């Protein structure tokens, strides 16, 4: 992974829970396209029809709180979201996102809908290119970057088995 992500912002507030991300009535849906067509329906009904591949969510505190459902980060990723920046995350959402290869970044960033943001996962620099402001985050280490680059934990594990690379490096 090159470590730099750039995209258009969708702004959300605090306490965006998993039921807002993907309402419970869709949890028995196995189609990723169907999940993506309802993503963020509980928070912003227009999101699913307007999100584009490469978009970034910027939110407040406690993003992904509520019930544990892996479908929440899966739906976001399949809809085209390439990263989520929030002041804090629910732990299970954070792990589920990393496990599927969706970068989740803890930082307080001022950005509005439509702003363009760049995130350097290696250096820890976040820039709001529209507003001209810069922020810091804890950089991802090489091991975490390799999980994200491989598309998530399962793919990383399978690649590790295939190549014989130890997961202890980095």
From Swiss-Prot:
Q: What pathway is this protein said to act in by its record?
A: Organic acid metabolism; 2-oxosuberate biosynthesis
Q: What Gene3D superfamilies does this protein's entry cite? A: Aconitase, domain 4
Q: Where is this site: Critical for substrate specificity?
A: 28
Alphabetized, the UniProt keywords read:
Lyase
Q: What class of enzyme is it?
A: lyase
GO MF: homoaconitate hydratase activity
Please give the CDD domains that the UniProt record associates with this protein: IPMI_Swivel
User: Which reaction equations make up its catalytic activity?
Assistant: (2R)-homocitrate = (2R,3S)-homoisocitrate; (2R)-homocitrate = cis-homoaconitate + H2O; (2R,3S)-homoisocitrate = cis-homoaconitate + H2O; cis-(homo)2aconitate + H2O = (2R,3S)-iso(homo)2citrate
Q: List the InterPro entries hit by this protein, alphabetically.
A: Aconitase/3IPM_dehydase_swvl (IPR015928), AconitaseA/IPMdHydase_ssu_swvl (IPR000573), Homoaconitase_LeuD_type2 (IPR053582), IPMI_Swivel (IPR033940), LeuD (IPR050075), LeuD_type2/HacB/DmdB (IPR011827)
Matching SUPFAM superfamilies: LeuD/IlvD-like
Q: Which domain of life is it from?
A: Archaea
List where the motif YLRT lies: 26-29
Instruction: List GO BP terms, alphabetically.
Output: coenzyme B biosynthetic process
Q: Recorded E.C. number(s)?
A: 4.2.1.114
NCBIfam families recorded for this chain? HacB2_Meth, LEUD_arch
The entry describes its oligomerization and partners as: Heterotetramer of 2 HacA and 2 HacB proteins.
Q: Which family does it belong to?
A: Belongs to the LeuD family. LeuD type 2 subfamily.
Q: What does this protein do?
A: Component of a hydro-lyase with broad substrate specificity for cis-unsaturated tricarboxylic acids. Catalyzes both the reversible dehydration of (R)-homocitrate ((R)-2-hydroxybutane-1,2,4-tricarboxylate) to produce cis-homoaconitate ((Z)-but-1-ene-1,2,4-tricarboxylate), and its hydration to homoisocitrate ((1R,2S)-1-hydroxybutane-1,2,4-tricarboxylate). Is also able to hydrate the analogous longer chain substrates cis-homo(2)-aconitate, cis-homo(3)-aconitate. These reactions are part of the biosynthesis pathway of coenzyme B.
The protein here is known as Methanogen homoaconitase small subunit
């Amino acid at each position: 992974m090159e470590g730099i992500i750039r995209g258009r912002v969708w702004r959300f507030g605090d306490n965006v829970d998993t039921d807002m991300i993907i309402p419970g009535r869709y949890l028995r849906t196995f189609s990723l396209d169907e999940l993506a067509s309802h993503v963020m329906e509980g928070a912003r009904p227009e999101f699913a029809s307007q999100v584009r591949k490469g978009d970034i969510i910027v939110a407040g505190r406690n993003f992904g709180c509520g019930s544990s459902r892996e479908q929440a980060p899966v739906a976001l990723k399949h809809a085209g979201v390439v990263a989520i920046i929030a002041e804090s995350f629910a732990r299970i959402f954070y792990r589920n996102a990393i496990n599927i290869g969706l970068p989740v970044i803890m930082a307080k960033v001022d950005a509005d809908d439509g702003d363009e943001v760049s995130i350097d996962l290696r250096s820890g620099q976040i820039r709001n290119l529209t507003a001209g402001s810069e922020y810091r985050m804890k950089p991802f280490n090489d091991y975490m970057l390799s999980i994200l680059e491989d598309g998530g934990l399962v793919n990383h594990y399978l690649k590790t088995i295939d190549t014989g690379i130890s997961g202890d490096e980095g």
